[in-house]
C-alpha cells in the first residue's frame, strides 16, 4: 500500500473537491506500478493512496518479487511511485499550462491555478510504502476496507468544498450528503463512479494486428473507472487471487 507523503501540503491550491490532473496522475502511477512490479494482479487507487495485490503462486515457476524481502519491496515501490507520479503529473499538466500561458488574457483563477501546478511540478511529490501479507481469502476484505474509506473521503471532500469546517463539525457522511442536496442542490451520487469509490487497474486480453498474419492475443493493463461496490461483487477481486 502506497501513500502520498505530506500530500496535504503538496495538493494545496489544487481544484476542489476533485482535481482532474491529480486523479489522472494517481491512475497513471498505479498503472505504471502494475506493469512493472512482478506478480501484481490488481491495483486500486483512491485519494492519495494506491493498493497493489501481488501473488506468487500463479504457477510452480512463479517467484515472489524480491523474494518477499519486505524492506526492499517497500523502498523500491515507493521510489517507483515517486518517479512515476512526478512524471505523470508534469505530463498531465502540460496542456492546461500551455493553454493558460499562451492565452492573450486569462482569469485570475486560471493564473492562480497555473501557479499551483508549476509549484507542484517544481516541488515534486514523494510516496511512502507499506508491505504486508494477508491470506488470499482476506484480500477482498482489505479492498472493501479501502473502498469504504474512499467513499467517506469522497463525501467529506465534496462537503469541505462547499461548507466551512464549523458547519461540518461532527457531521457524519449521511448528514453531509443531506446538507449538500438540501442547501447546495448537489447530489453526491451524481459524481462519476471513480470519484465516489476509486478505480482499479486490471489486466485484459486484447487482439493486436487484427486481420493480419501477425494477429495475436496480448495482455494489457487498463484503468477501470466503473468498478463495482466490492461488498456486492466480491468476485471482481476473488477471481484474480483465488487461483
Please place each PLM-identified region on the residue numbering.
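Regulatory and interdomain segments flanking nucleotide-handling catalytic cores
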Residues: 1-243
